[in-house]
A protein has these predicted regions:
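Short acidic, glycine/serine/threonine-rich loops at helix termini
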Residues: 162-165, 253-256, 417
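Short, well-ordered coil loops that connect the C-terminus of an alpha-helix to the N-terminus
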Residues: 117, 237-238, 246, 359, ...
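A generic "binding-loop/recognition-motif" signal
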Residues: 201, 246-247, 327
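General small-molecule cofactor/ligand-binding pocket signal
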Residues: 172-175, 241-243, 270, 402-407
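AMP-binding/adenylate-forming catalytic core of the ANL superfamily
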Residues: 195, 292, 298-398
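Conserved AMP-binding/adenylate-forming
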Residues: 230-311
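Nucleotide 5′-phosphate-binding alpha/beta core
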Residues: 1-110, 116-130, 137-141, 156, ...
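Active-site phosphate/ATP/adenylate-binding loop shared across adenylate-forming ligases
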Residues: 1-15, 71-218, 223-235, 259, ...
């Protein structure tokens, strides 16, 4: 089957909605066990990792994380691949911005490394075509049989978009290494029907009065902060949709109401609870569409928050109210009555920052040390600042007060991801 036919087949096969959890479980069960049989027979690492555990008991498989995967990548893959050659090609592509070289039918790319170490993703033409069909089903503003011009603002181009493009669907790549004012002129000339970009790019286009009228806007590759979502939505007069993707897979996408739902038609997402009462968890991903680089019982460091109640769109796929960030984004402040540290999740920091002044347009918050938090604000001359949000937070969490250092916030969209809240200080050192 050609790439384009496979993309169309996957588009048509992707359920628009699931009516019940029972339907989702039936859909997943057969596909997961079939996939695990394939992986066990073709991956030396997983065959050893699962030794003594039956395929049907896959929920008992030991977890995998990025470190374990990267340390065992050659034996984890289900295809023979010269990793040194693959890495050379991927590194060269990032420098030359020519992403066409591959190893056979395999494309190789690096993650952005926001978690501290860079991962690698390896996909075949078949997987890429399947992925494209799935994402078109979840993201197009209309039918695949209509005319579309999809603009993609990416840190690295993909070999696959050109292959699945057609007379009806055109893909345009906008390289984030270029200056943003140049990219804005280019996208205005293109005037795409669908715009997929990091929220920092969407925010830049909104702030600079970009003259385009897309039917659908999709935020991807960065956490969409409420302050950015509001401004982007108001400027373009529409719901800001989201693709929540990572090196480990396409984890969630929004429904027509703009609510994130886990992509449970292509993966099972288990939960390692951080705070079950409030719905915070680390996702444990079993992707039954990834064959070359299998992702099975893979624990992510991201923090997701379950949406309370059932989404009004009627889709039974698990709804997510927020992608809160990574474990690296959790602040740790010393308790008043001991030498132990209290974790403070990003949402609490965000709320305290937003109470500083109602005129805040953009911000960042970085924990620099055990006792210091840097807060960047835009505009930079806001006055007065109300610190009561932080004072209440320190009191409620029973932690020692941290020094709040106010600086100017400045971020120009580029290949570096925007992270509004994160921790530079290692509380374990």
């Amino acid at each position: 089957m050609s790439n384009k036919l496979l993309t169309l087949w996957r588009y048509l096969r992707t359920p628009k909605k699931f009516k019940s959890r029972a339907h989702i479980e039936r859909w997943q069960k057969r596909r997961i066990v079939k996939h695990i049989k394939f992986v066990r027979n073709n991956s030396v690492f997983y065959a050893n990792h699962w030794h003594g555990i039956a395929d049907d008991d896959w929920r008992k498989f030991p977890l995998v994380n990025k470190t374990l995967m990267m340390d065992n990548l050659e034996n984890l893959l289900t295809r023979d691949l010269d990793l040194k050659k693959a890495y050379r090609i991927a590194k060269s592509a990032e420098i030359t911005r020519d992403f066409s070289p591959r190893v056979g039918d395999l494309s190789i790319g690096f993650s952005s490394g926001t978690s501290g170490s860079r991962g690698v993703h390896i996909v075949s033409d078949k997987e890429a075509s399947n992925w494209a069909g799935f994402m078109l089903a979840r993201g197009l503003g209309g039918s695949i049989f209509g005319k579309h011009h999809v603009a993609l603002f990416l840190r690295a181009n993909s070999n696959n978009y050109g292959k699945i493009g057609s007379k009806r669907i055109k893909f345009s790549f906008f390289d984030l290494l270029k200056p943003m004012d140049q990219l804005q002129k280019e996208v205005e000339l293109a005037n795409p029907s669908e715009l997929i970009a990091p929220p920092s790019v969407l925010r830049y286009l909104a702030d600079n009065n970009c003259k385009i009228n897309p039917k659908r806007i999709i935020s991807a590759a960065e956490v969409l902060d409420p302050i950015d979502e509001k401004i982007i939505s108001q400027y373009f007069s529409q719901v800001v949709h989201q693709f929540y993707t990572s090196t480990e897979g396409e984890i969630a996408a929004t429904c027509e109401l703009g609510v994130l739902h886990l992509n449970e038609s292509i993966m099972h997402v288990g939960k390692e609870w951080i705070d079950e009462e409030n719905g915070l968890f680390h996702p444990i991903i079993t992707d039954f569409m990834r064959e070359t680089q299998p992702i099975i019982r893979y624990k992510q460091n991201d923090i997701l928050v379950l949406k309370k109640g059932i989404c009004e769109c009627g889709d039974a796929r698990t709804a997510i109210s927020e992608v809160m960030g990574r474990s690296d984004d959790v602040f740790y402040l010393q308790k008043k009555d001991s030498d132990e540290f209290e974790p403070i999740v990003p949402d609490f920091i965000r709320r305290a920052v937003m109470r500083l002044n109602p005129q805040i347009e953009a911000y960042h918050a970085i924990q620099k040390s055990m006792t210091k938090i840097e807060i960047g604000l835009q505009p930079s001359n806001l006055s007065p600042l109300d610190y009561s949000g932080f004072e209440e937070l320190f009191k409620q969490k029973n932690v020692k007060k941290a020094e709040l250092v106010i600086v100017e916030h400045a971020h120009i969209p580029s290949t570096n991801k925007l992270r509004r809240i994160y921790r530079e200080w290692d509380h374990n050192s």
